[in-house]
Amino acid sequence: MAPIDFRNKINWHRRFRSPQGSKSEHEILRIFESDRGRIINSPAIRRLQQKTQVFPLERNAAVRTRLTHSMEVQQVGRYIAKEILSRLKEQRLLETYGLDELTGPFESIVEMACLMHDIGNPPFGHFGEAAINDWFKQRLFPLDAASQPQSDDRCIVRDLRLREGEEPLNDLRRKVRQDLCQFEGNAQGIRLVHSLMRMNLTWAQVGCILKYTRPAWWMGEPPASHSYLMKKPGYYLSEEAYIERLRKELSLTPHGRFPLTWIMEAADDISYCVADLEDAVEKRIFSVEELYQHLYDAWGTHEKGSLFSQVVENAWDKSRSNTLSRSTEDQFFMYLRVNTLNKLVPYSAARFIDNLPAIFSGDFNHALLEDDSSFSQLLELYKNVAIRHVFSHPDVEQLELQGYRVISGLLDIYQPLLKLSVEEFTELVETDLMKRLPIETRLLHKLSTRHRLAYVEAVSKIDRTTAQWPVMEYYYRCRLIQDYISGMTDLYAWDEYRRLMAVE
């Protein structure tokens, strides 16, 4: 195993117009400050303020949006990063691990990854993801492509059907069909940063948001050694070359993860578990008294001095004493949040350091807060209560079903663009107006300029004389539609659906 030297991981070079030569500590910090500016000022971050965390289309400003959640994750990520660096300093290991002049970039990379971690999420969260994937599966039938060419291939797209004697073109068709049916917020985040917004972030900063390492076209089970790291798609076929370059620049193993990504993941886990419960109380799904009882009942055996006693019971007792003359709700969540952070942040830092060799190599096949400890049990307690009493609430389920219908409906509306032949769509894009295609012309005009330019750039790199041309053109056309719809905010998607369905 290679020695731990973070100077080989915190790569401050960029894909385009990268600074050259050696840099001082201050100059490297300025490079990552530039990353911060690019991220904070990006439209993708601003859109998070109109995407909700649990309750779509929520008008109550006290309930978290994706932006306020991401800011909370950012703060927790910073806390964990500082705790790790402080412990390494106490152990006199900063210089040994090549971090003595990289503490600032270490913190900044984690913070900005936390702020960005949700930028690829579509409207209506996981139900938006499910709607996109189900819609494409019902048209591309990727499982039909898993075998050899067959007469009953149900794929409705002629250029994507398998054909006898056309290997390896059939392999490309298989990859494309699988890839398009695996929309995932984390993979879309990578696509946003590189292909759509062209943010040109440092390799280290992008590496930190590559949460999962499975390509979206992967079929079959992942290797057991990386089953956790590959449990979801992490990037698309459209970003394959970029990710290959990223792995080279960051010295990552084929399915390995960037070391600081574990910190971002832990910060997200800690933040959303408490936040979802607080939002549920704000929405009057249950009272704070009922929440405490749910937590108490779900914990199981209660022993004096247990972690539950130190965190949840302590918060409950302090909130009942009302020493701060504030509402019981406010006090309970303040103490619960503080107690949770004070236990889980140091534990996350300790887990990171204790497993640093495997984490540095990128092959630690677990989350930091995924083990048989009471700390992991506490996190699971919060998650399970939310699953049982929040996400299954009729109001939440109704909103999720509405969101699923909105996204499915928008895909139906834009389907005429996907039904055009490669020749027709190419002509439409190049001329921007085709009298014989009035509906398709108007639908194309509704797509954002950024997404259309990304499509044009991608297809311009394909040789139109090859057999791959119609397959890859259709792939990028589907990406164009997915990019546009997934980039909408909850409210915009809702309003756009109502407008185009003429229900207003």
From Swiss-Prot:
Every HD domain range: 66-273
Reactions it catalyzes: dGTP + H2O = 2'-deoxyguanosine + triphosphate + H(+)
A single GO BP: dGTP catabolic process
Protein name: Deoxyguanosinetriphosphate triphosphohydrolase
Gene: dgt
The EC number(s) this enzyme carries: 3.1.5.1
Cofactor: Mg(2+)
InterPro entries cross-referenced by the UniProt entry: dGTP_triP_hydro_central_sf, dGTPase, dGTPase-like, dNTPase_1, HD/PDEase_dom, HD_domain, PHydrolase_assoc_dom
